[in-house]
């Protein structure tokens, strides 16, 4: 297929140059590429081709460092204008950028000129284009963007070699034909001419990739589909523009000349790396315009300062009207404008200063925590920042610390206050020198003659006032001796009335005396001891005992001072040790003694240790370092408690004897000992009793036996001969008038206590039983029956004893009255027992009505007692003599 074009001469020249002058080298990734080219290159000449994908596959931006060369996406290198190479090599770089991955690669291209001589013999490696068969593929065609026509506009023609043998019909497909944008291109099927129907915007379509087809009438395709690339040539139809209409930058004031302020960026939609997108920047106007403080680099758009005199206090904001123009800034290039705002950052370049050169104020003496003066300052730096916030200092005149100055955060004023009382009698005025600086460091301190601190003078006048007594010094120390006796006087606290410069008329009182050691003389302030001073008291800290004293004048004004009594140590305490130690036989056979002396070190160790003679048989004591001793067994002792008398003497000979309890135990550590507690065991003494002690024990035992024997003899029971009461009844029938209602009984339930009388003796026996009231007992001897009847009313106990040696008697001697005295308590007891319930508990207190015989009550019924089943233990009445059976029948329920 032959290529037909509108300009066959120019196409032929390009093919010749391409075949003779161009050398294309496919190189390794991102390495140098060497190309040999003719010394004279025309515009739009293909120089060579590099492999871009091997260096960076996803390159979104391809540009050349030399504007004389243009790089296509496939790696082809074209010249943008006529170029003449000297004999030396010429090099440039191809930059590949990936915006998403933020990667950038560089390919170095080196061009070397060669002579225009045709080689005698062409080798395959020297051939720029190898052609084994005539191909029907044309070179890429191009169309001008925004072309004005006329339309349809011829693009190019394709022809197939098969047209010599067949009737060929041509067709195309792809974007612009049967894809968006539709119907932009079409082809004449008979001739193969391709036409464009309308103008094209390159910013939408940079190129079109079409496919051409050659087929016969019957559909046979003698050729493969032909790729057709139609490139849209860029037209400078887009003016550059700033991404932001207004851009804001900041820069510190007083910065050096050449300081970078910021970089402006403009965008041009035309084809990159061409004159259409070669932009130039410049400043059209500065507001305010005098003096000129800024400049811009025309190619990079970086704005820098031109002077070091940017002063925020004069102007804090500048505006720059910027212009960006393409075509390398040529007047015919397209341009646009934007606004840049530059704000100056504040620096501490202005020190604060007082509004007045000096100040005068006054304050009453003895006043504290009062504000006496406020001082204002002025600062031109930015308000409410560390560059303008003031810090005040008192430089001179405050040696005693009477004043303090601070900053009011709301007004930035200096507030002068009195924190310690001033004395008019000592000084009537105070002159202070006050300085002020900023919180931030002054920025011009090293390069400027401006002072960083402003100072002023403050005169403080002190006003006299009638003040109270002064306790000076606040703490007074006096010396005393440990063990100082009671009733002695010590020098006390003295206060002063500053108005009269003496302590006359002042009265003193105690405010604090923890252990009440002293009393104070209210007129002189001297102390008098109430107790012996003891340095070892818990109220003494570091050998000092504190007393608070208040001095009061005539009108009630007062001051308070502290009197410290320093006690010098006196050797009044002997060394002390623990009362009990433990020796573990499984670990060691000794115990370590560590005495403690409450006195000071000068009255303490070294100590001396002595054993009593009675303990030397089993024990031995060894001194170690004057502070401790070792108590050791002479031989293994039994597991028990032992008492060991030990004497300990301090360095001045004060000695104390201690009875040390030593616990000898079968253990490894004292905490493992399981011997019973000391309070429940016997301590084995090591002291032998003397003869006088033994004699005293014997005499005491004899005396105790004598006392017990005497008490036994005195309290022995006497034997009283028993006798029988006379009885005049002599078994005669007694008229009891049973047919009548009987005698009136005023108390049915006769309760204890009851009185008894002994028939044989006129003496009465009354005993007391604990918790049961009075116990009464009656005894009757019945000669004939041979029994004695005892009635024990307090505890309810009844006994019947045989009377030994009594076998005779006259039964008629018993009188009726005596038997009545016997039966009346017994009947009362029976009635009392009938008043109990089935569990033998006492019944509730209630009145029981008893009817007369024959008036509704059953025979033999006496009320609540008729239902009882037990015989109350009266079986002994069955063995009485006949004369007692009548009484027994009366007592026993049938």
UniProtKB/Swiss-Prot annotation:
Gene3D superfamilies: Cadherins, TCF3-CBD (Catenin binding domain). PANTHER family: DESMOCOLLIN-1, DESMOGLEIN FAMILY MEMBER. InterPro entries: Cadherin-domain_protein, Cadherin-like_dom, Cadherin-like_sf, Cadherin_CS, Cadherin_pro_dom, Catenin-bd_sf, Desmosomal_cadherin. Keywords: Calcium, Cell adhesion, Cell junction, Cell membrane, Cleavage on pair of basic residues, Glycoprotein, Membrane, Metal-binding, Phosphoprotein, Repeat, Signal, Transmembrane, Transmembrane helix. PROSITE patterns: CADHERIN_1, CADHERIN_2. Binds to JUP/plakoglobin. CDD domains: Cadherin_repeat. GO terms for cellular component: cornified envelope; desmosome; extracellular exosome; ficolin-1-rich granule membrane; gap junction; membrane; plasma membrane. A component of desmosome cell-cell junctions which are required for positive regulation of cellular adhesion. Required for desmosome adhesion strength between the granular layers of the epidermis, as a result moderates epidermal proliferation and differentiation. Is therefore required to maintain postnatal epidermal barrier function and normal hair follicle morphology into adulthood. Residues 135-691 are extracellular. Calcium may be bound by the cadherin-like repeats. Three calcium ions are usually bound at the interface of each cadherin domain and rigidify the connections, imparting a strong curvature to the full-length ectodomain. The keyword Cell wall biogenesis/degradation does not apply. GO terms for biological process: cell-cell adhesion; desmosome maintenance; establishment of skin barrier; hair follicle morphogenesis; homophilic cell adhesion via plasma membrane adhesion molecules; negative regulation of epithelial cell proliferation. It holds the Pfam family Cadherin. Residues 1-29 form the signal peptide. Glycans are attached at residues 165, 546. This is Desmocollin-1. It is a single-pass type I membrane protein. Residues 715-894 are cytoplasmic. Residues 30-134 form a propeptide. The chain crosses the membrane at residues 692-714. Strongly expressed in epidermis, less in lymph node and tongue. The modification Phosphothreonine is found at residue 385. It is found in: Cell membrane; Cell junction, Desmosome. GO terms for molecular function: calcium ion binding. Residues 135-242, 243-354, 355-471, 472-575, 576-682 form the Cadherin domain.
């Amino acid at each position: 297929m032959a290529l037909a074009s509108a300009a066959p001469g120019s196409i032929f020249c390009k093919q010749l140059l391409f075949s003779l002058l161009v050398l294309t080298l496919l190189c390794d990734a991102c390495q140098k590429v060497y190309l040999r080219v003719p010394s004279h290159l025309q515009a739009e000449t293909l120089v060579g081709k590099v492999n871009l994908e091997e260096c960076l596959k996803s390159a979104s931006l391809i540009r050349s460092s030399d504007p004389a060369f243009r790089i296509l996406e496939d790696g082809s290198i074209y010249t943008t204008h006529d170029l003449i190479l000297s004999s030396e090599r010429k090099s440039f770089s191809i930059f590949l950028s990936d915006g998403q991955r933020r990667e950038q690669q560089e390919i170095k291209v080196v061009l070397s000129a060669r002579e225009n001589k045709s080689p005698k013999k062409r080798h395959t490696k020297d051939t720029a284009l190898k052609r084994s068969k005539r191909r029907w593929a044309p070179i890429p065609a191009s169309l001008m963007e925004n072309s004005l026509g006329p339309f349809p506009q011829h693009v190019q023609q394709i022809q197939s070699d098969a047209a010599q043998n067949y009737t060929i019909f041509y067709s195309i497909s792809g974007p612009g034909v049967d894809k968006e944008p539709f119907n932009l291109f079409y082809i004449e099927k008979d001739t193969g001419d391709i036409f464009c129907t309308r103008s094209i915007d390159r910013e939408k379509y940079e190129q079109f990739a079409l496919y051409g087809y050659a087929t016969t009438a019957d559909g046979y395709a003698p050729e493969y589909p032909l790729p057709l690339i139609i490139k849209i040539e860029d037209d400078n139809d887009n003016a550059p523009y700033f991404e932001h209409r207004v851009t804001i930058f900041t820069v510190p004031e007083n910065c050096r000349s050449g300081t970078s302020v910021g970089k402006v960026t403009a965008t041009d939609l035309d084809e990159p790396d061409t004159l259409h997108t070669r932009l130039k920047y410049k400043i059209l106007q500065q507001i305010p315009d005098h003096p000129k403080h800024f400049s811009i680099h025309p190619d990079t758009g970086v704005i820098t300062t031109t002077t070091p005199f940017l002063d925020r206090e004069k102007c804090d904001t500048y505006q720059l009207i910027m212009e960006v123009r393409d075509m390398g800034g040529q007047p015919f290039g397209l341009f646009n404008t934007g606004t840049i705002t530059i704000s100056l950052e504040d620096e501490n370049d202005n020190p604060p200063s007082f509004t007045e050169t000096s100040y005068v104020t006054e304050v009453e003496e003895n006043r504290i925590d009062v504000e006496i003066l406020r001082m204002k300052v002025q600062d031109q730096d930015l308000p409410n920042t560390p560059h303008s916030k003031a810090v005040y200092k008192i430089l001179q005149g405050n040696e005693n610390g009477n004043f303090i100055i601070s900053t009011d955060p709301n007004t930035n004023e200096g507030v002068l206050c009195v924190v310690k009382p001033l004395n008019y009698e000592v000084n009537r005025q105070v002159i202070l020198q006050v300085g002020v600086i900023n919180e931030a460091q002054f920025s011009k301190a090293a390069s400027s003659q401006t002072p960083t601190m402003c100072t002023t003078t403050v005169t403080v006048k002190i006003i006299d006032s009638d003040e109270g007594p002064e306790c000076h010094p606040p703490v007074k120390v006096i010396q005393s001796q440990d063990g100082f006796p009671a009733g002695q006087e010590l020098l006390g606290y003295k206060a002063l009335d500053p108005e009269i410069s003496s302590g006359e008329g002042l009265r003193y009182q105690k405010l604090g005396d923890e252990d009440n050691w002293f009393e104070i003389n209210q007129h002189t302030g001297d102390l008098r001891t109430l107790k012996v001073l003891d340095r070892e008291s818990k109220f003494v800290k570091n050998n000092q005992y504190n007393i608070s004293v208040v001095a009061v004048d005539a009108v009630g004004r007062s001051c308070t001072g502290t009197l410290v009594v320093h006690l010098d140590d006196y050797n009044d305490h002997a060394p002390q040790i623990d009362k009990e130690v433990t020796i573990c036989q499984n670990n060691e056979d000794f115990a370590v003694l560590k005495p403690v002396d409450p006195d000071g070190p000068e009255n303490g160790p070294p100590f001396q240790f002595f054993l009593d003679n009675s303990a030397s048989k089993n024990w031995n004591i060894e001194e170690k370092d004057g502070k401790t001793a070792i108590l050791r067994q002479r031989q293994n002792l039994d597991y028990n408690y032992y008492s060991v008398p030990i004497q300990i003497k301090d360095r001045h000979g004060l000695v104390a004897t201690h009875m040390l309890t030593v616990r000898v135990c079968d253990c490894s550590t004292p905490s493992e000992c399981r011997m019973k507690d000391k309070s429940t065991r016997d301590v084995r003494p090591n002291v032998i009793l003397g003869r006088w002690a033994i004699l005293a024990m014997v005499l005491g035992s004899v005396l105790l036996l004598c006392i017990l024997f005497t008490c036994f003899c005195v309290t022995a029971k006497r034997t009283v001969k028993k006798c029988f009461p006379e009885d005049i009844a002599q078994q005669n029938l007694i008229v009891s008038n049973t047919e009548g209602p009987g005698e009136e009984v005023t108390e049915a339930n006769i309760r204890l206590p009851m009185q008894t009388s002994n028939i044989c003796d006129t003496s009465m026996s009354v005993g007391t039983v604990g918790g049961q009231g009075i116990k009464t007992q009656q005894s009757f001897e019945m000669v004939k029956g041979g029994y004695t009847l005892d009635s024990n009313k307090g505890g309810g106990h009844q006994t019947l004893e045989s009377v030994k040696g009594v076998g005779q008697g006259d039964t008629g001697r018993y009188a009726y009255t005596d038997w009545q005295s016997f039966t009346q308590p017994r009947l009362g007891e029976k009635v009392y027992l009938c008043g109990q319930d089935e569990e033998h508990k006492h019944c509730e207190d209630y009145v029981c009505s008893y009817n007369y015989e024959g008036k509704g009550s059953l025979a033999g019924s006496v009320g609540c007692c008729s239902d009882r089943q037990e015989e109350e233990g009266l079986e002994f009445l069955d063995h009485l003599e006949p004369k007692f059976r009548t009484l027994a029948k009366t007592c026993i329920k049938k």
